[in-house]
């Protein structure tokens, strides 16, 4: 089947198999930030933004993205660069959390801790738990608020 998908701002027109996963399509096109983890849509490593909404690309057929816009971390480096260091400073892994954090901050630039946890709930973190990510995002938001107030 023929599809047209805008990936990180670039239109890709291609013939694909109807059972091709979005994850495999994206990796074929150089989006290596999209990881294959559990393959059961439980871990969140494969999270991408489909028309701005986080989806698990290991459970989305490429055909579903036909006519839509997909963003991976490769296309959102500038937006992510503000807060990933804050997450890393907490010793927390960033696997899949970055895409959900971008979606959260676009929707709600001043989320509560419960709202942050709700957005991160789609990611399974066996390495560092969720508290490091929460602290990193909270520290980033505190930094941004201090900057806005001219205290940074």
Regions found by a protein language model. Give the residues of each.
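Signature of N-terminal electron-transfer/Fe-S-associated modules in redox systems
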Residues: 1-152
């Amino acid at each position: 089947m023929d599809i047209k998908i805008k990936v990180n701002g670039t239109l890709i027109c291609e013939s694909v198999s109807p059972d091709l996963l979005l994850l495999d399509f994206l990796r074929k096109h150089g989006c290596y930030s999209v990881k294959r983890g559990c393959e059961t849509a439980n871990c969140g490593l494969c999270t991408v933004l489909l028309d701005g909404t986080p989806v698990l690309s290991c459970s989305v057929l490429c055909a579903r993205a036909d006519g839509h816009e997909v963003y991976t971390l490769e296309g959102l480096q500038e937006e992510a660069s503000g807060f990933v260091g804050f997450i890393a400073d907490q010793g927390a892994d960033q696997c899949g959390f970055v895409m959900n954090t971008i979606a959260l901050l676009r929707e709600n630039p001043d989320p509560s801790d419960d709202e942050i946890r709700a957005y991160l709930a789609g990611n399974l973190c066996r390495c560092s738990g969720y508290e490091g990510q929460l602290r990193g995002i909270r520290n980033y938001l505190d930094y941004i608020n201090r900057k806005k107030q001219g205290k940074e």
